[in-house]
Amino acid sequence: MEFKQEVLDVLAEVCQEDAVKENPDIEIFEEGLLDSFGTVELLVAIENRFGITVPITEFDRDEWNTPNNIVNKLTELK
């Protein structure tokens, strides 16, 4: 499975919403799909699944606001 699809699967699990896979440009915070607790859960899931540590200080909602942006940021950190 390609990295992008794996990230979208993790995001869909955390958000409990397949819309993140169907529309990778959806604004996940604006749409209420992810909140601060979900953000922590997502960062832990990313670290567990991919071994990528994202310091909370590096997490800017404006840069991590869509599934596509999340994939791009994680690709940079890989």
Swiss-Prot record:
> Which InterPro entries does this entry report, sorted A to Z?
ACP-like_sf (IPR036736), DltC (IPR003230), PP-bd_ACP (IPR009081)
Post-translational modifications reported in the UniProt record:
4'-phosphopantetheine is transferred from CoA to a specific serine of apo-DCP.
Disulfide bonding pattern of the chain: none
Give GO cellular component annotations, separated by semicolons.
cytoplasm
Q: Where is the PTM O-(pantetheine 4'-phosphoryl)serine found along the chain? A: 36
Its primary localisation, in coarse terms, equals cytoplasm
Domain Carrier residue range list: 1-78
Q: Name one GO biological process term.
A: cell wall organization
> Which Gene3D superfamilies does the protein's record reference?
ACP-like
Tell me its family.
Answer: Belongs to the DltC family.
Q: What is this protein called?
A: D-alanyl carrier protein
Recite the lineage of the species.
Bacteria, Bacillati, Bacillota, Bacilli, Bacillales
Query: Which gene name belongs to this protein?
Result: dltC
